[in-house]
Amino acid sequence: MSEESAPEIQRGNGSFTGPGGGNIFEHWWRPRNEARAAVILVHGLKDHGARYDHVGEWFAGHGYATHAFDLRGHGESAGERFFVASFDEYVDDLDTFVARVLEKEPGKPLFLLGHSMGGAVASLFVLLRKPDLEGLVLSAPALEPTANVSPVLIWLSGIISRFFPRAPVTKVDIKALSHLPEVIEAARKDPLSNERPAPARTGYEILRAMRRIRERSHELTLPILIMHGTGDHLTNPDGSKKLYKQAASEDKELKLYEGLYHELLNETEQERVLEDITLWLDERLR
């Protein structure tokens, strides 16, 4: 476990034993003074918590204790790289981490922030486990296949996943992450997030999670903020629009950012996005 200090925040990282006995790596950023609330950040496919250091710093600087972890098979956590036999394993990881954060931040209101595939993990977690949350924030959530994924390909994915679960099929186009060249370059050089396609089973489980969320989206009743860039080619903005319409939440908001690519938190207007999230969080605490 390590911990570093900055003038206004404290940051650190460590690890704990996750469901099934694997090692799960975690990160945290806390304000030096008493935190107003806690935020848990859930990253996406082939992603990891350390890439959100600037996000953790931002929220800690605005009074929010921020916690992130590397999903199994991602970042510095144990597990076969980017492989998951069932999406419920990611949900189990998050469930364990939420309990851990609640122990560290007793009595604090808790928000969940899920990005990309992490948005699907967070959404399914809320639907299945019914946690006591102050609100849910979804950044470019993976809720519906993109236009280039045909119904035939979706059907075939189940067959490929069954017989060739580790076949490399799910590729992430790094150039579609952001307009910022430095973000693309950093992603290319990141040894924890390489350009190797993810396994077929993982891709199929993501598609299955999308369907499960669509089937139960009307059960969402907690405050929810959904954000998507209209230029996103990695996750479908239509999925965010549909979730906004179908969610039963009385307190729900959809924000579309014209022309922005997939990583809203690593984009040309990332400060605006962070300000929008912070304002939304602040308003839920009043």
Identify the residue ranges that each predicted region occupies.
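Catalytic active-site module of serine/aspartate enzymes centered on a nucleophile-bearing elbow/loop
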Residues: E253-R286
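Alpha/beta-hydrolase fold nucleophile elbow
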Residues: E105-H115
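Alpha/beta-hydrolase-fold enzymes
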Residues: H115-A198
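N-terminal cap/lid segment of alpha/beta-hydrolase-fold proteins
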Residues: S2-N33
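Short beta-strand/loop motif that positions the catalytic acidic residue
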Residues: L220, I226-H228, D232
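Short alpha-helix in the alpha/beta-hydrolase fold that links the catalytic acid
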Residues: L222, N236-K245
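Conserved alpha/beta-hydrolase
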Residues: G56-G79
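Catalytic nucleophile-loop/oxyanion-hole region of alpha/beta-hydrolase
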Residues: L45-G49, G75-E105
